[in-house]
Amino acid sequence: MTKRTSAKYKIDRRMGENIWGRPKSPVNRREYGPGQHGQRRKGKLSDFGLQLRAKQKLKGYYGDLTEKQFRRIYAEAERLRGDTGEFLIGLLERRLDAVVYRAKFVPTVFAARQFVNHGHVTVNGQKVNIPSYRVKEGDVIAVRDKSKQLAVVLEAVGLAERDVPDYVDADHSKMTATFVRTPGLSDVPYPVVMEPNLVVEFYAKN
């Protein structure tokens, strides 16, 4: 198992949930966290604990973002007028690696980050290798011709465990995807419950 795959499943174990809905997640087989103390029964979380957990789960889902990365995105959402939690979700879903994942060009969000980093993707015909690149409505994301037959791409397209959401218009025959619109929380096909409202509460108090 690669370090990247190990890190992904460690997040699942830490959260106690299969946050990406993967069949091989270890939490499908056991109900405790990682490490030697993982089998201890967890007590009821405080309000702070619930807020922290909501933040950690959302950070983890998008590839285990660093606190600095996540806090910067949150600060941008907070500056917008309206529902900060909804804006936070929209900004996260506009990351290029998130769109590559949603389009089913790759099997995991971790693979999406690596795929973009290695220069396999274009946006409106121009190569972009920055996973955090902010996609706009109408942008066309494509897998470069030389990358279309990579095993990771062929595996992802055939995955039955998740569908492409309606805010991404993917054409797998051409390996292109148009970002149609910025989604809200109810539009995003999270396999588990995400609570951006608790993330807002966390940052309001800390």
From Swiss-Prot:
Quaternary structure annotation from Swiss-Prot or TrEMBL: Part of the 30S ribosomal subunit. Contacts protein S5. The interaction surface between S4 and S5 is involved in control of translational fidelity.
NCBIfam families reported in the protein's UniProt record: PRK05327.1, rpsD_bact
The keyword Magnesium is annotated on this UniProt entry: no
Chain residue ranges for the region called Disordered: 18-44
Record GO terms (molecular function): rRNA binding; structural constituent of ribosome
InterPro entries (alphabetical): Ribosomal_uS4, Ribosomal_uS4_bac-type, Ribosomal_uS4_CS, Ribosomal_uS4_N, S4_RNA-bd, S4_RNA-bd_sf
Family stated for the protein in its record: Belongs to the universal ribosomal protein uS4 family.
Entry function: One of the primary rRNA binding proteins, it binds directly to 16S rRNA where it nucleates assembly of the body of the 30S subunit.
Keyword Cell membrane included in the entry's annotation: no
Gene: rpsD
Pfam families: Ribosomal_S4, S4
Top-level division of the source organism's lineage: Bacteria
Gene Ontology biological process terms from the UniProt entry: ribosomal small subunit biogenesis; translation
GO cellular component entries: small ribosomal subunit
Keywords annotated in UniProt: Ribonucleoprotein, Ribosomal protein, RNA-binding, rRNA-binding
Protein name: Small ribosomal subunit protein uS4
Domain S4 RNA-binding: 94-157
The species this protein was found in: Jannaschia sp. (strain CCS1)
